[in-house]
């Protein structure tokens, strides 16, 4: 599989963001620090932001829109790993939400630099694990 050099260039950022987010999991709707990290990682303003969730929109040449969604929340379990980037609080990203966020942030970076023909919507949703987050985003 051939991977574009522009995508490869985002690899170090992807790893750094994933590890940063892995260290700071939050649960349910209490994702204020996580969402602040997301907002500070993206060089454009959020189109909707309430402190614990957010939406970024990139207009395209076409009226059709493709939406991407990722989860912000972790689980209320203590991490027992000894990684240098292990969780620093009593929660854990055990389901990959830290990776989903990192991938989505880097995808957004890519499309800011390489506009797409369709409009793109990036949805950062809280409370996927505990429920209610999707309804909040709608």
Where are these regions (language model features)?
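Acidic/His- and Gly-rich active-site-bordering loop/insert found
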Residues: 2-93, 102-105, 109-118
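Acidic/histidine-rich catalytic neighborhood of metal-dependent amide-processing enzymes
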Residues: 99-138
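Membrane-interface loop-to-helix entry segments
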Residues: 95-97
